[in-house]
C-alpha cells in the first residue's frame, strides 16, 4: 500500500513539475514580483529555505533581499515585510486589502475552516464575531469587573510559593503555578469558573489537550504538505491526530463549560439584568438570537484558550527571566514600588498606572521577547500592490514585528534589556501601535484586542512577584538560560527555568 502511494505521488509530482514550469512562465510575464531567492518548479524556495520560517531566519533574508521580499514555498507565496513604512502600508493604509487571514491545512482543522474570529478571512463573519466578542472580553469595563479576581489569583500564587520551603533554597519551576493562575484569570471571565489546584483532574485534562493543540499547530513539520499539495498524502497520519485532538477539545469545552453554563442559567433564573454576566452568557445570547451557531460558540472558546492564555503566560515567563538575569533592574523596580505604594502595600490594577518603571519593564519585555514576533499572518484576498510590486492574490503576508523592534538602524543597542530606553530616546513609544517600529499587539483592523487584558495582568503579576520576593537563579547558576523556541508564529522560552524566590520581610 505504501509503495502504491509512493508510485502515485511520484507520477503526480512529475506532471506537477511540467504544469508548474508552464504556469510559472505565464505568471512571470504578468507580475512584477518582490525580490527573493530564485525558486525551482513545484518546490519553489522550500528546498533552499526549509521549514523553519522563524523571525531570525527571515531577518537574515531581509538583510540580503531588502525590506520586502518574496519566498515561493511550493504553491504558496510568502511575502515578508521588514520596515515600519511597509508595516504601516500593510496594517493601516491598505488594511482592508491585506486584512484577511491565510489558511493552512492544520489551522483549517482547528478553526473549522475559519468559523472563529482570530483566523477567519476579513469580511462580514469577522466583523460579526469581533462585535460579539468585544463587549464580554475587550473593554475597560471588563478589566474593572475582573481585576479583583486577577489580584486574588496572583495573591494565591504568592501564598502557595511561601508554603514551599524549597522555593527559597533550591528553587521551583514557577511556570506551572503561573499557568494555573492564567487559566483561572481567563476562565473567570469566560465561565465564572476557577480551578482550585494544579491537581484538579479537569484542569489537567484541559491543559494537556490545549498543549497538544499548540504543539501540533505551531510545529514546522507539516509545512511540506501545506506548501506542496502533491505531498499532502504523507500528512494523513498527522492530520488525523489533529482532527482527533480538535474533536476532544471542542467536546470538552461543550460538556464541561458551555452546557454547564446553559444549565445554570435556565435552572437558577438568576441571570436577570442586575446580575453580572460572564462572557459565555453574552455569547450564548448571540447564539439564541441566531447571530452565530453552536460551532461558532465553541471556536470562540478555542480562540481564548489559545490566543489569551498561553501568549500572556509566555510574556510573564520572559519578564521574570529578564528580571532574574538583570538584578539591578529588578531592584530598581522594587524600589519604585516601595517608594510609590509603601512597603508591603500590594499592587492593584490602578496602581500599575502610577508605576512608570514597571510599565517600561513590560514594554521592554514585549520588545525584546515578542510573543508573536511575526504577528498573526495576514493575506490579501485579491491581487494587490505594495511598494511598486505586485502581490498575487492569497499571498501570506508576514510582518517581522520582532525585527522592527530590534533593528539597530532604528533602535539604540536593541540587543540589551534596557527599560530606561522608554524614559529616554523612546519615551513616546507605547504598546498600542502608535509607532510602527513597535507592534507587539499589531495595529489596525486585525490587531490583537487582548492588549486590554494582557497589559494589566502583566503589570499585576510581575509587580507583585518583585515586591514580595527576591528572584534569583538557582544555586550554581549566574543566569537563566533564555534560549528561544519558535513556532509557526510564536516565541517562547525553550526551557521552563527553576528560580529561587526569597520572601521579603515588610
UniProtKB/Swiss-Prot annotation:
**Top-level taxon in the UniProt lineage:** Eukaryota
Binding sites annotated in the UniProt record for heme: 448
Pathway membership of this protein? Phenylpropanoid metabolism; trans-4-coumarate biosynthesis; trans-4-coumarate from trans-cinnamate: step 1/1
Please indicate the residue ranges that the annotation assigns to the motif Nuclear localization signal 2. 247-254
Got a GO cellular component term for this one? nucleus
Where in the sequence is the signal peptide annotated? Answer: none
List the InterPro entries: Cyt_P450, Cyt_P450_CS, Cyt_P450_E_grp-I, Cyt_P450_sf
Keyword Oxidoreductase in annotation: yes
Which Pfam families does this UniProt record tie to the protein?
A: p450
Which chemical reaction does it catalyze? (E)-cinnamate + reduced [NADPH--hemoprotein reductase] + O2 = (E)-4-coumarate + oxidized [NADPH--hemoprotein reductase] + H2O + H(+)
Spell out the molecular function terms from Gene Ontology: heme binding; iron ion binding; trans-cinnamate 4-monooxygenase activity
Family membership: Belongs to the cytochrome P450 family.
State its role.
Component of the floral volatile benzenoid/phenylpropanoid (FVBP) biosynthetic pathway that controls carbon flux to pigments essential for pollination or UV protection, to numerous pytoalexins synthesized by plants when challenged by pathogens, and to lignins.
What is the protein name stated in its UniProt record? Answer: Trans-cinnamate 4-monooxygenase C4H1
Organism of origin? Petunia hybrida (Petunia)
GN (gene name): C4H1
Amino acid at each position: 500500500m505504501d509503495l502504491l502511494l509512493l508510485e502515485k505521488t511520484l507520477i503526480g509530482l512529475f506532471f506537477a513539475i511540467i504544469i508548474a514550469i508552464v504556469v510559472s512562465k505565464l505568471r512571470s510575464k504578468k507580475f512584477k514580483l518582490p525580490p527573493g531567492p530564485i525558486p525551482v518548479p513545484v518546490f519553489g524556495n522550500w528546498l533552499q529555505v526549509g521549514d523553519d520560517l522563524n523571525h531570525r531566519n527571515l531577518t537574515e533574508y531581509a538583510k540580503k533581499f531588502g525590506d520586502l521580499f518574496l519566498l515561493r514555498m511550493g504553491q504558496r507565496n510568502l511575502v515578508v515585510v521588514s520596515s515600519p513604512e511597509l508595516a504601516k502600508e500593510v496594517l493601516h493604509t491598505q488594511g482592508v486589502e491585506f486584512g484577511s487571514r491565510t489558511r493552512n491545512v492544520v489551522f483549517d482543522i482547528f478553526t473549522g475552516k475559519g468559523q472563529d474570529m482570530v483566523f477567519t478571512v476579513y469580511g462580514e463573519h469577522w466583523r460579526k464575531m469581533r462585535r460579539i466578542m468585544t463587549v464580554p472580553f475587550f473593554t475597560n469595563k471588563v478589566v474593572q469587573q475582573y481585576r479583583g479576581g486577577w489580584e486574588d489569583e496572583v495573591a494565591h500564587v504568592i501564598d502557595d510559593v511561601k508554603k514551599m520551603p524549597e522555593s527559597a533554597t533550591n528553587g521551583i519551576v514557577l511556570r506551572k503555578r503561573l499557568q494555573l493562575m492564567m487559566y483561572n484569570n481567563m476562565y473567570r471571565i469566560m465561565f465564572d469558573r476557577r480551578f482550585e489546584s494544579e491537581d484538579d483532574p479537569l484542569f489537567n485534562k484541559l491543559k494537556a489537550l490545549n498543549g497538544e493543540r499548540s504543539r501540533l499547530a505551531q510545529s514546522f513539520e507539516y509545512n511540506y504538505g501545506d506548501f506542496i499539495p502533491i505531498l499532502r498524502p504523507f500528512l494523513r497520519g498527522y492530520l488525523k491526530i489533529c482532527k482527533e485532538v480538535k474533536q476532544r477539545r471542542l467536546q470538552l469545552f461543550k460538556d464541561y463549560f458551555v452546557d454547564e453554563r446553559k444549565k445554570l442559567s435556565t435552572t437558577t433564573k438568576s441571570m436577570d439584568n442586575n446580575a453580572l454576566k460572564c462572557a459565555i452568557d453574552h455569547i450564548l445570547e448571540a447564539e439564541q438570537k441566531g447571530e452565530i451557531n453552536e460551532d461558532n460558540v465553541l471556536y470562540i472558546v478555542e480562540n481564548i484558550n489559545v490566543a489569551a492564555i498561553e501568549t500572556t503566560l509566555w510574556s510573564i515567563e520572559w519578564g521574570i527571566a529578564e528580571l532574574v538575569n538583570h538584578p539591578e533592574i529588578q531592584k530598581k523596580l522594587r524600589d519604585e514600588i516601595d517608594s510609590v505604594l509603601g512597603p508591603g502595600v500590594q499592587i492593584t490594577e490602578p496602581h500599575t498606572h502610577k508605576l512608570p518603571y514597571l510599565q517600561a519593564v513590560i514594554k521592554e519585555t514585549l520588545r525584546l521577547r515578542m510573543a508573536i514576533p511575526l504577528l498573526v499572518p495576514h493575506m490579501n484576498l485579491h491581487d494587490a500592490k505594495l511598494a511598486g510590486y505586485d502581490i498575487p492574490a492569497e499571498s501570506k503576508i508576514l510582518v517581522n514585528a520582532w525585527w522592527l523592534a530590534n533593528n539597530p538602524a532604528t533602535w539604540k543597542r536593541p540587543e540589551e534589556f534596557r527599560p530606561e530606553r522608554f524614559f529616554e530616546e523612546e519615551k513616546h513609544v507605547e504598546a498600542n501601535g502608535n509607532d510602527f517600529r513597535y507592534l507587539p499587539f499589531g495595529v489596525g483592523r486585525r490587531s490583537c484586542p487582548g492588549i486590554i487584558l494582557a497589559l494589566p495582568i502583566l503589570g499585576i503579576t510581575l509587580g507583585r512577584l518583585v515586591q514580595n520576593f527576591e528572584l534569583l537563579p538557582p544555586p550554581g547558576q549566574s543566569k537563566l538560560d533564555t534560549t528561544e523556541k519558535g513556532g509557526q508564529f510564536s516565541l517562547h522560552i525553550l526551557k521552563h527555568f527553576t528560580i529561587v524566590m526569597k520572601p521579603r520581610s515588610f
